[in-house]
Amino acid sequence: MIQVLTNNPLEARFSFFPAPVNNKKPSKVMTLKDAFGYITGMQARERTQALRRIGDKKEARAYKGTHFDYVTFSGEFSYGADDKLIRHSGLLCVDFDHVADVAKVKEMLLGDDYFDTQLLFTSPSGDGVKWVVAIDLSQCDHRTWFKALANYVRASYGLVADPSGINVSRACFLPHDALVYVNSNVCPF
């Protein structure tokens, strides 16, 4: 049985890994509030702008992998691998790559009636969306939640989720996004 620290997204904890992506040793534990601060802060602003100026896909992928810090939204890890999960956060990050209209996708997901968005931001490349939602692991496991959510967004919105999100240790690169959405329960303003 996977240990879950809490079912309260406010208390969810997950691992932070400094770049590059082949670094599998986390340096600290973060919260959604910490991730919001990082994404809206200046840590990744220059590298996000630089990545978006790169025209070659292969070069852009290499740049992202060497320059961007990342988190594992679904939990705390002793090492960046599924079998090194310490505890699940109760969060799931769904990645939508190469969408035609980022603003429209964000609007649809924020208006969803079934899933309460915890964090929503534009991907480092600028043409994708990262959607972090709370899941209840007492109902089913991480992989089943991912499959259900992927099927749901495809049927409801015609969106295709990146299938790698099925892995609990999936890396999520942290870009700069001044327009990131954070649930008001996480950061009340």
Locations of the language-model features?
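Detector for Asparagine
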Residues: 7-8, 22-23, 151, 167, ...
